[in-house]
Regions:
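Short capping segments at the starts of secondary-structure elements
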Residues: 11-21
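Phospho-regulated, low-complexity intrinsically disordered regions of nuclear gene-regulatory
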Residues: 1-13, 28-77
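A short acidic, leucine-rich amphipathic alpha-helix
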Residues: 22-26
Length: 77
């Protein structure tokens, strides 16, 4: 699984703000990320979270803490 999909899966399953280290830990423990396939998992998680935040898919709550952004289409349902 790519870091983007792994991060979104963890944040969807947890449905709560998480520190990036917890997101990384859960993704590794659940087998979403393989440190042998993804070199430098830490950097991958951090840069992917920044990219997802700039796209509006995740929001930053505090330093290093992220949560899944509420989508406009989800709010209407």
């Amino acid at each position: 699984m790519e870091p983007r999909a792994a991060i979104l899966a963890v944040l969807t399953e947890e449905a709560a703000p998480l520190h990036w280290t917890k997101i990384q830990d859960l993704a590794l423990r659940r087998g979403y990320l393989d440190p042998f396939e993804q070199p430098d998992v830490r950097r991958q998680v951090q840069t992917t979270l920044l990219a997802l935040a700039s796209e509006g898919l995740v929001e930053k709550q505090a330093k290093g803490v992220y949560f899944l952004a509420a989508r406009a289409d989800d709010a209407e349902d």
